[in-house]
Amino acid sequence: MIINTPEEMFKLGQELSKKYKILLLLGDLWAGKTLLTKWFANGLWIDENIVQSPTYAYINSYGWKLLHVDMYRIWEENDVWEKWINDQISKHEYIAIEWPKFIDSLDISHYAKITIEKDWDSRIVEISEN
């Protein structure tokens, strides 16, 4: 699908919040992964204005409702990380993971894999389910 406006991204985030508990978000820097997560959060009755990119923090938690993870700077899998992230996942109802890696070691099932590609002023969004 092609997203041409912020309103269309808002609508997509709202729809995803009604259908999925877990989002795996792929795309280049500034593609719109965090923006989509803001609108996903809004659909969960979380104020989208408090949702920020977890790039530097690695992980942002919005109560026990939403866990927002960025794996961009996670270079290798290890037992400590795996145990810690799975512990965090088990404590949250909804999960959004940017730059997902090591998916086989995460305790997740039935997720939407969302790829966002920049195309001038629009975004090309592909959604697949697992």
Predicted regions and their residues:
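N-terminal pre-Walker A segment at the start of P-loop NTPase domains
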Residues: 1-16
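Hydrophobic anchor at the beta1->P-loop junction of P-loop NTPases
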Residues: 25
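Short beta-strand-centered segment that lines the nucleotide-binding/catalytic pocket of NTP-utilizing
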Residues: 47-62
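P-loop (Walker A) phosphate-binding loop of NTP-binding proteins
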Residues: 28
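Short phosphate-coordinating micro-motif centered on Lys-Gly-acidic
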Residues: 78, 86-130
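Switch II (G3) loop of P-loop NTPases
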Residues: 68-75
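Conserved lysine of the Walker
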Residues: 33
